[in-house]
Amino acid sequence: MTKAQPEPSTQASDAAASGSGLDPSHCFAFPLDDFQLEAIDALNQGHSVVVSAPTGSGKTLVGEYAIYRALAHGQKVFYTTPLKALSNQKLRDFREQFGDENVGLLTGDLSVNREASIVVMTTEIFRNMLYAEADEHDDPLADVEAVVLDECHYMNDSQRGTVWEESIIHCPPPIQLVALSATVANAGQLTDWIEKVHGPTTLIVSDHRPVPLQFSFCSAKGLHPLLNEAGTGLHPNCKVWRAPKGQKRKGRSNKPPQPEAPPISFVVAQMAQRDMLPAIYFIFSRRNCDKSVRDLGAQCLVSQDEQARIQARLAAYSAANPEAVRDGIHADALMRGIAAHHAGVLPAWKELIEELFQQGLIKVVFATETLAAGINMPARSTVIASLSKRTERGHRPLMGSEFLQMAGRAGRRGLDSQGYVVTVQSRFEGVREAGQLATSPADPLVSQFTPSYGMVLNLLQRHSLDKARELVQRSFGRYLAGLDLVDDEEMLSQLRLQLSQL
């Protein structure tokens, strides 16, 4: 395992330029961090790479280098993402970076310039491509040098994680994989598994955050530090609220209720007073995101000059996209530096919000957690409104990795010396739960591989029964189970040895 440090070194830079690769100094006009250079060096040695690093640390640059190198070789790159919104943003970013003619897009409902050298797509599209019967004269994987798996930690998603496993298992070995993941507890196991099922793979790990995070807690009494100076536990001034005797939570849980949550307008005002805006305010419901925009009432977060700039951009947008302008409440809120961003918003309106937020003209955007998935909307602060969420399998607490992914959106590299993460008192979760999540380690990746009838039919169309069975048995879950079996066998061997000595 490679443990990377944040500062670039001459030795690492020289190594990265070696082999059949492209000198990174020809691609980027700024010094690279060591972990980026080490990943580039591994790619130039012909290895696939797993890059595990905190959100906002610069992992995407490794994927961008793979693109520059493929273009220099006259080859292609597929860049996969978990979300259509992220694919659309990558299309815009890469067009600006590499030229319109070089970039295409494939999602479930859109196909743009699919023969381009760089094709951005959702991971499901890539998986389906691997299952499709390749035409002798039209192989979609021909000339593909590398596949970038952005947000690879989505392997943990209970509904969609299997797509990432299937993509890795079935990707042809000559194609290099660039797996970009947020910090996970078992990145070494992921790397070892990819090496077994795909080919030589190098793990690059960095735990360095370019912009450190400060955790705060907001209750009806105000905004206060959440953690102690060491960041290992609750701040001495944080008091865990205890319900009066006899007060019970309604419903099935016996957990006592917490104090009422502070109004959103109060939370935003507290942050504005401390110069903690712009902020992404995470709320796990589209309806409540829109409601929160209305709940801020007439609160204005922008100056007259900023308002004039928003007005000019909104007028130009309205002229070009009259059908995409949201109702009067949302347009009015936009003029005050407030917006909602979620899957129910038209893509063109979301693009406008992203543009204005990147320019610092929107001060608070209420968003569902999909915005934590790498969409380029860097903020000074993130606010996490609830420490539990409703899922298809019922209500559950946030996982540590989910919390860290949202928290990691705070802090803009090159703009902020500090990023701020604000957790908010809710009716049933308070400072204790916030402290536990803020100090919890990253979760390990687990296998979500689920052989479906469709998968089996796809495999049998292309392979014999024995080969199809062998491919299904390559899953990450089977690999992890094998590790447990090795440990059990070692324990049995030790017990047998002890018995023989009695």
Segments and roles (model prediction):
Residues 1-49, 75-76, 232, 304-335:
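Helicase-associated low-complexity/disordered flanking segments
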Residues 41-48, 59-75, 165-171:
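Walker A/P-loop NTP-binding motif
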Residues 75-131, 192, 202:
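Conserved nucleic-acid-binding Ia/Ib motif block in the N-terminal RecA-like helicase ATPase lobe
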Residues 80, 95-104, 282, 286-364, ...:
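Conserved C-terminal RecA-like helicase domain
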Residues 119, 123-127, 134-179:
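SF2 helicase catalytic motif II
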Residues 169, 176-178, 183-295, 339, ...:
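Conserved interdomain linker/interface between the two RecA-like ATPase lobes of SF2 helicase motors
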Residues 377, 381-439:
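Conserved segment of the helicase C-terminal RecA-like domain
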Residues 429-502:
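Long, largely alpha-helical accessory region at the distal end of helicase-like NTP-driven motors
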